[in-house]
């Protein structure tokens, strides 16, 4: 028996602790408001300014300005639909087969004990709606530019900013952001570690810093993944109901850093987060490919290498269907392409299954959703194709480079005369912040802009 396996006699009765529906601030429902806690969370996210801003943030810049392309808002809606479908699929008996073999426990018993762990539609949609709200304008270029400017103050990263918006910045409360339930916040945290620890150790690397943003070697400043130290208080509150063993295990990295340029990644995430992340990966790999095909960013010739790679994966479904799907993806008939996209999404969703992560005390950490190795390999082919031919597309890179320059210059300008140039609310926050926290206020302001708003402000300056 492997180290992390659990005997049937060790299976604890399923109990979801009531603390997972607690909020940082007392927040009783309003009169006659009978909504469950996660439905209230969903409403707060949907009605937030940060969520609305996603409609003006482009998912893939090279695809251009037309009525078809996806924004981060439409992407988030599609992730929510896929996430809900994954939750529905995980209720079926066959999704427990692999876990049943791992634990040597009858799959019917597992289904009975674990189904109540699954997030409600309100909860999974909340996570999917929220997952991108911390991403700054101009994609990875904008993210890396802000990390460059914040390197000595804890760095910047989109997932960390999402947690910060939910727990501090969104003005639903004065100082606790949207004041969401603990379980919703747990589901948003993909990387439960401090960003400054997970990121490359810039102080040791002595990378060149150039005051002219045109000449910054931006790839030296790609951030790691984690939580800002500024938000440690809320992160500690989030995990305070876990046992000491669970907290330590949950925040472990996959490996020990071997050199200061290396980014570290955490090993674990919650069940809810694993479902949301799968939904995001499927939407990225399949729907972003659809955008690129429709708008002519990629062509059948470029697809051939991916087609060959997919045929080599040991999957009966792929062997039987990939020729037809590849043909229909690039068909002149729109309905054929939509059928191919639908078949691919269905393939990924219907292969989801339960897995054991480690011997956590908390069941929401002990189990995750996963795809079998051959299906992960297939999804990896799609994601790599999008990365190689869409994200790395020269038009995308030029737009991100332009955005990186704009954000870096704006940061420098605001930092030079914040009391004159920042909006009043932001200026008040800047003035009230301690000296070591003032740059974070400027960073929050720039990160919250849409692509178009950032361009307008830059032109004003």
UniProtKB/Swiss-Prot annotation:
Domain of life: Bacteria
The name this protein goes by in its record: Deoxyguanosinetriphosphate triphosphohydrolase-like protein
Disordered: annotated span: 22-41
Lineage, uppermost ranks: Bacteria, Pseudomonadati, Pseudomonadota, Gammaproteobacteria, Pasteurellales
Disulfide bonds: none
Regions of compositional bias (Basic and acidic residues) in chain numbering: 24-41
Family per similarity comment: Belongs to the dGTPase family. Type 2 subfamily.
GO biological process: dGTP catabolic process
Gene Ontology terms for molecular function: dGTPase activity
Record keywords, A-Z: Hydrolase
Keyword rRNA-binding belongs to the record: no
Protein species of origin: Haemophilus influenzae (strain 86-028NP)
Domain HD stretches: 72-285
Family matches, as SMART domains: HDc
């Amino acid at each position: 028996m492997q180290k992390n396996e659990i005997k049937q006699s060790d299976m604890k009765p399923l109990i979801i602790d009531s603390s997972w529906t607690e909020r940082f601030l007392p927040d009783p429902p309003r009169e006659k408001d009978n909504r469950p806690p996660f439905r209230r969370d969903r409403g707060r996210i949907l009605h937030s300014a940060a969520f609305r801003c996603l409609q003006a943030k482009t998912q893939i810049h090279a695809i251009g300005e037309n009525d078809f392309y996806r924004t981060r808002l439409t992407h988030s809606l599609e992730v929510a639909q896929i996430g809900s479908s994954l939750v529905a699929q995980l209720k079926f008996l066959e999704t427990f087969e692999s876990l049943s073999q791992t634990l040597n426990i009858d799959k019917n018993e597992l289904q009975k004990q674990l189904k109540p762990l699954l997030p409600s539609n309100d909860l999974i949609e909340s996570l999917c709606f929220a997952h991108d709200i911390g991403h700054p304008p101009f994609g990875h270029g904008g993210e890396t530019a802000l990390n460059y400017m914040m390197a000595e103050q804890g760095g910047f990263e989109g997932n960390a900013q999402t947690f910060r918006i939910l727990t501090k910045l969104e003005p639903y409360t004065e100082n606790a952001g949207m004041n969401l339930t603990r379980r919703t916040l747990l589901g948003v945290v993909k990387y439960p570690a401090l960003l400054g620890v997970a990121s490359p150790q810039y102080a040791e690397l002595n990378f060149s810093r150039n005051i002219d943003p045109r000449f910054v070697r931006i790839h030296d400043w790609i951030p790691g993944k984690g939580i800002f130290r500024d938000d440690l208080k809320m992160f500690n509150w989030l995990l305070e109901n876990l046992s000491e063993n669970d907290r330590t295990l949950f925040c472990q990295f996959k490996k020990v850093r071997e050199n200061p340029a290396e980014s570290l990644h955490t090993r674990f995430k919650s069940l809810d987060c694993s479902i949301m992340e799968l939904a995001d990966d499927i939407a990225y790999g399949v729907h972003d490919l659809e955008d690129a095909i429709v708008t002519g960013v990629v062509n059948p010739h470029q697809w051939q290498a991916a087609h060959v790679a997919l045929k080599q994966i040991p999957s009966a479904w792929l062997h039987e269907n990939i020729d037809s799907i590849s043909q229909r993806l690039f068909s002149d008939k729109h309905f054929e392409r939509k059928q191919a996209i639908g078949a691919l999404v269905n393939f990924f969703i219907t292969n989801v299954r339960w897995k054991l992560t480690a011997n956590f005390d908390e069941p929401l950490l002990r189990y995750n959703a996963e795809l079998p190795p051959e299906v992960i390999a297939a999804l990896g082919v799609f994601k790599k194709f999008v990365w190689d031919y869409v994200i790395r597309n020269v038009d995308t890179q030029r737009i991100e480079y332009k955005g990186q320059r704009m954000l870096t210059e704006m940061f420098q300008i605001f930092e030079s005369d914040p009391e004159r140039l920042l909006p009043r609310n932001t200026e008040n926050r800047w003035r009230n912040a301690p000296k070591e926290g003032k740059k974070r206020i400027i960073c929050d302001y720039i990160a919250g802009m849409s692509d178009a708003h950032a361009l307008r402000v830059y032109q004003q300056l």
